């Protein structure tokens, strides 16, 4: 830099300094300091409840986290679902489960105004058109079924509830004896299950019984042909679009259920039989009839085909009669499970995807106290649960995945549900209210979502477990525990007992995913870490909590 330039620069600095010479500026560094916590301390901690021990850092404490029981609710909605279910399975582990379905029907086409079914029509045959979308068990094992006529619609007209459940009993509304019978599957007669990845229609020929002809006569208006000049005429025009309400009063529908036990032998697990799901809107009963020439009744004129479609959505098809379909599921549990339902704690629990038993997980007093102690460990502390992972292990699994036997666990994994849900209420619990199914806060379920939900709940095949993020649930339980303590910091457990205001905060129901409450898969899961008759589980349910504490 030249001296001349340096001189100009110095002059400039002098001028700026002179301009501010008369100004004084005082900075107040205390502004807002009342909002800054004094002596603030923030720590991130991790604790694990595993096999009856709580570990946090170098600290270990014997704490049993949870117990498990078997629980069953019949209050699972089974009306107007996408599928209806039928079949019979027997298992030495899970007991028997049997399903049938009840459905109203609607005509598939309009009858001719002038000729109806034709002149002196003849009943030829009746088929059942199924659209199998899922199955479970031995699909080669034959099962006999009965088709019963619904004789009364009182179950709809006299009911204040438009929802029906798996325990619905159709006995008072159906005929005592079947109007048809059939065997399914029936390979000799061409009735196969098919490929569920590419479903197709499967037509089953129905076999007549003593009551078939009387039923068909009413469908075809042939009970008294003399009144209609020997034509099977629809004089009331119930087969006419717009008169669906009158139709379902006259043709009330069907109930299809297994007769007897499944045929065939047992598989390697000692199980026999099968269960099926058929898409209800793609299923129907189809009547084939023939009409004659009036001029020469010995000659067949036409073939008349009428389909009686199962449940048709009034929203989708804008029909004026909202008809109903209901699946009924019956369970006969093995004696061990029957005595354990709502009873004693179990080491190995179960989850059945078809209205069977599920697992009730109840957190222990000492676990709840340990959560309260976290909040009370520091004066005026604030605790935030960053993450809480609940791990539920399949039977045959282990904490050390290298110890899992691949040969045995693969079979178990293949039969397990792809996802499980956690619920604060599952059906008719303490109040006995039906279909009272409420997920825990973390389980935001939907069939389609544009976001990834942290709950997870999917089967981890590598570790043979289900992992659920229950951070909100644990946070709520922790706050409830800390807010309900006495002067000594002991939790007031009476509030968490049945009938108490906080009773529901300590219990979770492990059950099928919310969008798959009806499914055929079922499995045994390792239960809690509470000792039962001197025995404990090898890999009980674990909980890992990461939390931040600030004071």
For each feature predicted by the language model, list its residue ranges.
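Secreted, disulfide-rich extracellular signaling modules
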Residues: 2-9, 13-551
């Amino acid at each position: 830099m030249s001296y001349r330039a340096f001189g100009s620069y110095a002059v400039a600095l002098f001028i700026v300094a002179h301009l501010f010479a008369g100004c004084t500026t005082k900075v107040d560094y205390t502004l807002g300091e009342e909002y800054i916590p004094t002596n603030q301390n923030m720590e991130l901690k991790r604790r694990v409840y595993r096999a009856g021990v709580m570990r946090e850092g170098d600290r270990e404490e014997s704490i049993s986290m949870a117990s498990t029981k078997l629980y069953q609710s019949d209050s699972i909605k089974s009306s107007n679902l996408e599928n209806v279910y039928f079949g019979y399975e027997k298992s030495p582990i899970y007991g028997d489960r049997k399903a049938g379905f009840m459905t109203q029907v609607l005509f598939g086409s309009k009858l001719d105004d002038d000729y109806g079914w034709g002149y002196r029509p003849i009943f030829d045959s009746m088929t059942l058109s199924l659209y199998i979308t899922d199955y479970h068990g031995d699909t080669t094992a034959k099962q006999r079924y009965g088709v019963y006529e619904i004789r009364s619609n009182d179950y709809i007209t006299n009911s204040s509830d438009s929802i029906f459940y798996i325990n619905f009993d159709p006995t008072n509304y159906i005929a005592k004896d079947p109007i048809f019978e059939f065997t399914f599957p029936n390979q000799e007669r061409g009735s196969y299950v098919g490929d569920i990845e590419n479903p197709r229609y499967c037509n089953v020929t129905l076999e007549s019984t003593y009551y078939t002809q009387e039923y068909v006569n009413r469908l075809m208006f042939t009970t008294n042909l003399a009144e209609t000049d020997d034509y099977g005429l629809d004089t009331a025009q119930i087969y006419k679009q717009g008169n669906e309400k009158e139709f379902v009063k006259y043709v009330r529908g069907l109930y299809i259920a297994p007769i007897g036990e499944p045929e065939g032998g047992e598989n390697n697990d000692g199980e026999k039989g099968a269960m099926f799901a058929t898409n209800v809107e793609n299923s129907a009963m189809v009547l084939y009839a023939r009409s004659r020439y009036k001029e020469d009744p010995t000659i067949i004129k036409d073939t008349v085909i009428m389909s009686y479609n199962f449940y048709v959505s009034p929203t989708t098809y804008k029909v004026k009669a909202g008809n109903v379909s209901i699946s009924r599921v019956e369970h006969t549990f093995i004696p061990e499970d029957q005595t354990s339902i709502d009873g004693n704690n179990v080491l190995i629990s179960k989850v059945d995807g078809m209205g069977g038993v599920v697992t009730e997980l109840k957190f222990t007093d000492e676990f709840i106290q340990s959560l309260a102690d976290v909040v009370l460990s520091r004066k005026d502390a604030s605790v935030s649960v960053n993450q809480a992972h609940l791990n539920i292990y399949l039977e045959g699994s282990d904490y050390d995945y290298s110890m899992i036997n691949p040969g045995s666990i693969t079979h178990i994994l293949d039969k397990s549900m792809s996802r499980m849900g956690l619920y604060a209420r599952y059906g008719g619990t303490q109040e006995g209210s039906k279909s009272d199914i409420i997920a825990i806060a973390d389980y935001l379920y939907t069939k389609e979502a544009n976001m990834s939900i942290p709950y997870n709940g999917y089967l981890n095949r590598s570790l043979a477990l289900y992992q659920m993020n229950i951070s909100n649930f644990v946070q709520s339980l922790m706050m409830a525990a800390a807010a309900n303590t006495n002067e000594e910091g002991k939790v007031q457990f009476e509030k968490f007992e049945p009938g108490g205001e906080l009773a529901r905060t300590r219990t979770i129901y492990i059950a099928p995913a919310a969008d798959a409450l009806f499914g055929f898969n079922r499995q045994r899961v390792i239960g809690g870490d509470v000792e039962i008759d001197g025995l404990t589980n090898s890999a009980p349910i674990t909980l890992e909590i990461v939390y931040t504490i600030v004071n």
